[in-house]
């Protein structure tokens, strides 16, 4: 199969900026390349085909170029409607592989997260499961690291993260990390803590609670 590699994976920009996304094919695909734009909850929209041909109705600020193995999509002057995820797709072979996507996000100012920790509810514990939630609110940029510690022992493999779409008003993100344990495991330990590292924090922030005291 022909593999498609896009870069960068995220691009932070402001309205009016000129931005360029690169797509590389693992072998020559001539000009059999399409570009798509996708917004959350919507189907992908075709922007460009045959590497540089604009789909009908697509604004001329979108410019495609390249052939063989290297291609670019340039937006000459970024508009508010252009903040979305962009994908390249080769259609030289039957596999019609897509690139992994490039998210064009609003360039914000660095903002540290507000961090909260929530123990499992009594209702949930009755069902035999315990979920501890660490919530990070209103931060930028999107990269944030959450580490769970139970009685000071680092946890791995038993938590899941979910990040919101970028807030249209203040350009920030929010994130929830959920540590899931059995009720029996939960009741074997006392101190539950989440440690958060982010560019906006001069040092990691830890929020914790003692089981049975909250």
Swiss-Prot record:
Transmembrane segments: none annotated. Immunoglobulins are composed of two identical heavy chains and two identical light chains; disulfide-linked. Residues 109-214 are annotated as: Constant (C) domain. Residues 1-108 are annotated as: Variable (V) domain, involved in antigen recognition. GO terms for cellular component: extracellular region; immunoglobulin complex; plasma membrane. Disulfide bonds join 23-88, 134-194. The keyword Isomerase does not apply. GO terms for biological process: adaptive immune response. This is Immunoglobulin kappa light chain. SUPFAM superfamilies: Immunoglobulin. Keywords: Adaptive immunity, Cell membrane, Disulfide bond, Immunity, Immunoglobulin, Immunoglobulin domain, Membrane, Repeat, Secreted. Its main location: secreted. It is found in: Secreted; Cell membrane. Immunoglobulins, also known as antibodies, are membrane-bound or secreted glycoproteins produced by B lymphocytes. In the recognition phase of humoral immunity, the membrane-bound immunoglobulins serve as receptors which, upon binding of a specific antigen, trigger the clonal expansion and differentiation of B lymphocytes into immunoglobulins-secreting plasma cells. Secreted immunoglobulins mediate the effector phase of humoral immunity, which results in the elimination of bound antigens. InterPro entries: Ig-like_dom, Ig-like_dom_sf, Ig-like_fold, Ig/MHC_CS, Ig_C1-set, Ig_sub, Ig_V-set, IgV_Light_Chain. Residues 2-99, 113-210 form the Ig-like domain. The lineage of its organism: Eukaryota, Metazoa, Chordata, Craniata, Vertebrata.
């Amino acid at each position: 199969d022909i593999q498609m590699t896009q870069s960068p994976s995220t691009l932070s920009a402001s309205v009016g900026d000129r931005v360029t996304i690169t797509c590389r094919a693992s072998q020559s695909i001539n000009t059999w390349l399409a570009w798509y734009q996708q917004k959350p909850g919507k189907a992908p929209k075709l922007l460009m085909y045959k590497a540089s041909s604009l789909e009908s109705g697509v604004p001329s600020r979108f410019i495609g170029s390249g052939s063989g193995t290297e291609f670019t999509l340039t937006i000459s002057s970024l508009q508010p409607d252009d903040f979305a995820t962009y994908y390249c797709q080769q259609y030289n072979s039957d596999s019609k592989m897509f690139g992994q996507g490039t998210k064009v996000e609003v360039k914000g100012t660095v903002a540290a997260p507000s961090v909260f920790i929530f123990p499992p509810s009594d209702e949930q514990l009755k069902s035999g499961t315990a979920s501890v939630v660490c919530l990070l609110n209103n931060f930028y940029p999107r990269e944030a690291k959450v580490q769970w510690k139970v009685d000071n022992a680092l946890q791995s493999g038993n938590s899941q993260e979910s990040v919101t779409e970028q807030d249209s008003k203040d350009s920030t993100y929010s994130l929830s990390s959920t540590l899931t344990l059995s009720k029996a495991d939960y009741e074997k330990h006392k101190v539950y803590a989440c440690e958060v590292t982010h560019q906006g924090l001069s040092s990691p922030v830890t929020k914790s609670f003692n089981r049975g005291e909250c």
